[in-house]
Amino acid sequence: MKNFFRISFLITLFLGFHLSSNAAEKVEYLKTDWSFKGPFGKFDRAALQRGYQVYQEVCSSCHSMKYLSYRNLVEEGGPEFSVDQAKAIAASFEVKDGPNADGEMFMRPGRLSDKFVMPYENEKAAQAANGGAYPPDMTVLVKARGGGVDYIYSLLQGYEDPPVGINLDDGVYYNKYMYGNKIKMSN
């Protein structure tokens, strides 16, 4: 679980985009000397906390991290917020709970035991808000994409003007590392 959490928060350092599978296309990704690579690699707590901040301020408006709970914010190897900080973060979100004594659902402040709040009620609502695209959940993106963190880093660096003769619809951007070179998440 610790590695799962570490990887999830590393992703937030580099994401704020919509991507689809690139399995059919062979490209050379940008390489970076990651501090966490190798048998003696480790994550930088301050970087993970900044990563959470980036996720919260940028990515979470479209992307979920549905496999994490707010209690994961205090775990060793993750961003290691204090319990009080994590409780404050959780409480800043409204969570649907219930039913109450009258059989009705109600909203309450989040708790450490709650899963991260989703940006949309369901997949259809997410697609409707994003021009038909479903922003992927960020919890396991590094493991889900070929190339892992190098792919994600490359994708974030790969936005450029389309080559001559390539026309893009409104809300679609050219990215040399994206399968098909088209992405709906703006740079």
Indicate where each model-derived feature is located.
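Extracytoplasmic/lumenal ectodomains and periplasmic regions of secretory and membrane proteins
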Residues: 149-187
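Structured domain cores in non-transmembrane regions
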Residues: 73-135
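Post-cleavage N-terminal segment of exported redox proteins
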Residues: 2-9, 13-42
